[in-house]
Amino acid sequence: MAAGCLVGQRAGPLSDKLSGYCWVLLPLLLVATAQASVCRLKTGDGRDSESCGTNLELEHSFELDDSIHFKKRGSLIWSGTAEQSISILQKQLTEDERNKLRDIANLNGLYRIRVPRKLGITEEANEYVTSFVRACSMVESHLSDQISVHTDISGNVVGISIVTFPGSCNGAEVEDVDLEMFNTTVYIQQPIAAAVPETAAFIERLEMEQAQKAKNPQEQKSFFAKYWMYIIPVVLFLMMSGASDAGNQGGNGGGGGGSGGGR
C-alpha cells in the first residue's frame, strides 16, 4: 500500500510531501506486521514457543488398513497465564479425508489423536500422548468431540482423552456437509492439590489451652481433691453400716448357743 502511493505522482512540492508521507507510512506498516507475528516467531517441532502462550500441535490418524499415520489436525493454543486457559484452531477435512473416514467407520476402525509431551525435542525423539475413539462415533457425531489435556501439577502434559457426542454407533446416515468442520470443546484437566494439614494452627491451639490451664490451677485438681467432702461421708456411712451388721450377727449366734445348753 505504501509503495503504491508513489506511483503516478507528479514532480513538485505537493508530490514531494506526499512521497515523504508514504515513506513514513511504510515503516509503520512493517512495525505493525512484526508485532502481529510476535506470538508465532519461534517454531519448534510439535510445539511453538510464543510470548503469549504455547502452540501445541494436534495430530490425527485414520487409515483403512488400521496402520497409524498421523497428520496435523490443528493447534491447541495454550495460554501462559496462571489460569491455564486453552483454545483450538483446526483445519477443515478435505473431500478425500471425509470419504476415507466414512470407509473406516464402515469397517469399525479407529480414529486416533495425539499431542507431544515435551517442548524443544525433534519429532523423531519426541514423546506423545494418544487417545482414540471408534471412527463410526466420530462420523455420527458430525465431528463433535471433546478433548481433555491432562497435566501434572507443574503444567506438563501427561495424557489426553477424547469423547464424542453422542458416543454410540447406530448406523445413522450422515450428510457430507456435516463432516467438513470439527466442533470441538477442549479442556485442561489439572490435579487438585490435597489439603495441607493445619499443623501450625493445631499447635497454636494446643499451646493456648495449656496456657489457659496454667492460669486456672483449680481445673487441674484430681477427682478426690475436688469431691472429698462428698466422698468421706459416704465412706463413713458404709463403715458404720458394716459395723452394725457385724454386731447383730454376733448377738444372734450367742442366743442360739444358750438354748442348746439348756437341753
Swiss-Prot record:
Keyword Protein transport: no
Residues spanning the signal sequence: 1-34
Keywords for the protein's UniProt record, in alphabetical order: Endoplasmic reticulum, Membrane, Signal, Transmembrane, Transmembrane helix
Primary localization: endoplasmic reticulum
Compartments reported by the entry: Endoplasmic reticulum membrane
Entry keyword annotation includes Transit peptide: no
A Pfam entry, by short name: ECM10
Transmembrane regions: 223-243
UniProt GO BP: protein insertion into ER membrane by stop-transfer membrane-anchor sequence; tail-anchored membrane protein insertion into ER membrane
Membrane topology recorded in Swiss-Prot or TrEMBL: Single-pass type I membrane protein
Segments in the Cytoplasmic topological domain: 244-263
Lumenal-facing ranges: 35-222
GO cellular component, one term: endoplasmic reticulum membrane
Subunit structure and binding partners: Component of the ER membrane protein complex (EMC).
Role this protein plays: Part of the endoplasmic reticulum membrane protein complex (EMC) that enables the energy-independent insertion into endoplasmic reticulum membranes of newly synthesized membrane proteins. Preferentially accommodates proteins with transmembrane domains that are weakly hydrophobic or contain destabilizing features such as charged and aromatic residues. Involved in the cotranslational insertion of multi-pass membrane proteins in which stop-transfer membrane-anchor sequences become ER membrane spanning helices.
Family: Belongs to the EMC10 family.
Matching PANTHER family: CHROMATIN COMPLEXES SUBUNIT BAP18-RELATED (PTHR21397), ER MEMBRANE PROTEIN COMPLEX SUBUNIT 10 (PTHR21397:SF4)
UniProt-recorded name of the protein: ER membrane protein complex subunit 10
Natural source organism: Xenopus tropicalis (Western clawed frog)
